[in-house]
Amino acid sequence: MDDVVIIGGGIIGAASAYFLSKEGRKVKVIERDPTYKTASFPLSLGGFRRQFFQKENILLGKFAREFIYQIPNLLKTEKNPNPTASMVTNGYLLMFGPEHADEQYKALENHKVCEAGTKNIKGSELSKVFPYINSEGIETATYTDNQSEGWIDPFMFHSALKSKAIELGAEFIKGEVKSISEIKAKTIISAAGCWTKDLLEDIPVVPQKHTVFRVKCPKYIKEMPLTGDLTTGVYWRPEGGEYLAGSPNSVFDATDLEPAWNDFEELVWPALAQRIPAFEELKLTGGWAGYYDCNKLDNNAVVGKHPKFDNVYMASGFTGRGLMQAPGIGRALTEIITTGSYQTIDISDFAVERVLGNNARPEPYVL
């Protein structure tokens, strides 16, 4: 019988394998597509942030930053003595309309308690800090300028985690698991992401397709933060002389990754041009679509022991946050598996019982 079997070798599976292997557990990771062609992490914008509503998400975001900064030391291997995730620390800027202002002020209290280091700015003052932004319709905004938020290369991060886990003794194999009952192990972790319901049908996690557009503009602002306009749901960041912009539209239970090209002219371009006048001259140069493993109950992760099994744990439903929360979730799963409780960040409120009992804890800061 195996010691630990992880179903899913994406970013959550790789992070869990790393932390468990560090503790001396014998880990086997089963991944059906080692190219990760349709996995969530390589098709994301690579963002990491601590600007959230729920305290657990804020703290997981803080740990992500700490971990990413230590990649050169933590994840170096004999084959790769200089691992990197190509971190860019331009920060995050989130903008809110009047309808979200009260909720945002409550969130700021959680930011203070968790020492998130975010700054609040009135909408009327926004253009003084970011002169290229039209602040019409913005009531308040939060941002960071202390190198605590930004983005990374998702594939490089995953590769570094996986390589280190393998050096520590983890085994990654190609295979497809169709039923939990197939696995004979002391501990089983479902990190199946969008396809969680194929294994645990009582968990409300489904694929949610999002489209990202690549655009070019004569005015390129390299130092622009990853910006989310929560009045429209559109978000964007600079990338290699161009910009990447995400559509607020999404498709639940999608079975393909064909980009929603019509969204660009109908939704994304108008929203971008209204917020940043220079974006009126945008030109679409490409795009792609990727999946969120969306928790339809409340957009929050589902993590912990499944009460219907003696030895099954799970981690999914990150709704676009899997990459940034992977280090904290991998560590948390290792803690609860090896000690029986969370030792660092208490994520007990993300428990499986929450979704089985339909007890929502909404996370409104979803991009």
Each predicted region: which residue ranges?
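Short hydrophobic core segments
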Residues: 5-7, 183-194, 330
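C-terminal catalytic lobe of FAD-dependent flavoproteins
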Residues: 276-367
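Central helical "cap/lid" subdomain
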Residues: 37, 186-225
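Active-site lid/adjacent beta-loop-alpha segment flanking the redox-cofactor pocket in flavoenzymes
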Residues: 217-311
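Flavin (FAD/FMN) cofactor-binding and adjacent substrate-gating region
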Residues: 70, 95-168, 173-174, 295
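Dinucleotide-binding Rossmann-like beta1-alpha1 core, especially the glycine-rich loop
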Residues: 45-129, 233-234, 272-273
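N-terminal Rossmann-like FAD-binding beta1-loop-alpha1 element of flavoenzymes
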Residues: 2-28
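Glycine-rich FAD pyrophosphate-binding loop
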Residues: 22-41
